[in-house]
Amino acid sequence: MSYRTKAVAAAMLSLASFVPMSFASAADLPAYKVKAKPVPDLPFFLVIDDRVTFSYIGTGTDPGVFSAKPGNTGWNGNTAKSVYSFTHFDVWAYGTNFFGINMFKSDHNDPTAPCINAGVLPGGIAASCSGATEFFGLLRSTYGWNEIFNTKMFSYGPLHNISFEIGAEGEAENNYLAPNKRAFEAGLQFAFDLPYKGYFNVAPLAYKELNHNAFNQCGNFTAGAIPGATCSVDGETNFKTTWAVEINYYMDLGFLPESVNYFAISGRAGFYGPKGDANGLPLNSGVGVASTATKTEINSEPIRLTFDASKAFWGPKYAQFVTTWVSYRYWENKFGLDHNAELGVCNAVIGGTVQSTHSCTEQSYQAGITVKF
């Protein structure tokens, strides 16, 4: 809970528990009736924060989607993406809830169906398909031990609280792959305080994912395949349960002079363990660059610099209403795909040699503007 939230909650609790101490007993009360003021109720949500964002990723990627560079000198796996986002955050008596939904609109290097890759239809026929549209939603909820057990024993030094954490994710995209991600997480969160009203959270979790891959569908690029062994009956992939660690932090740059005290830094990182064969078909996996075994995925935004534009131009009363920001993103083994293997996806033959498609590890900058309402 933020400093502001704790201050508001403490003030309201002090009002709710206020008892006039100037009367020794009921016998001292005056003869006439005094109508007591109603005790204000605490709101169910102590904080509600809703925001919309538009941002742009110049060099995003989508694994397995790439085009040849001029002269067949290598592969271009970069995809520019426009991102439209809505986020909701709330604090209630026993914890927090976060929900976010994003729409990513790609350029032509990440095409929609029926193209199977940039500028290519099934059978190798040339075509120009529009950029794909992806929807991704994420939910995280925490339940604080201090609040559940009505204690402060889980706060010590910089440790602010320990919480149960549960979460879910969903994703779908209108490309040929036709992904349909459903993921679930459960574990603990350790919340630490940082200077200048900041925080640092670490959450070890169990992670389970289900997905879909149209390329694995029996009868689709799988002549002579064995259903359930070398092709998927319905294209569904049931990954093994694995481990995950999610980290996020935030801190105002409060050490700056008041005249320029409009900046904050934040970041996040998610580490997700291997979850079995990428296609759910281990009999198809080869060795070396032909392997389809998943690897540990690192999905991170190590640093984001935020400028509080509304505070700078309209004053402290309007802090955080309009912010602009820029961030650096690093995503290794995207979706768990081994960037050193996965022949035909993360690596492919060009000019007689196997070269990286540069689509399974993303290094990009993202810039955006966020409005709170």
What name fits each language-model region?
Residues D62-G71, D110-A118, N175-P179, N213-F221, ...:
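Outer-membrane beta-barrel translocator domains and adjoining extracellular loop/strand segments
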Residues S359-F373:
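Outer-membrane beta-barrel "beta-signal"
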Residues P179-A309, P316-K317, Y328, Y365:
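Detector for outer-membrane/organellar transmembrane beta-barrel domains
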Residues W75, F99-P179, I298, A341, ...:
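Surface-exposed loop and membrane-interface regions of Gram-negative outer-membrane beta-barrel proteins
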Residues M1-F45:
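Cleavable N-terminal export/targeting peptides
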Residues P38-I48, F89, Y94-G100, W145-S163, ...:
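Short loop/turn motifs that connect adjacent beta-strands in outer-membrane beta-barrel proteins
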Residues F54-G60, M103-D107, I166-N174, P204-H212, ...:
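Transmembrane beta-strands of outer-membrane beta-barrel pores
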Residues G58-V83, A127:
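Surface-exposed strand-loop-strand hairpins of Gram-negative outer-membrane beta-barrel proteins
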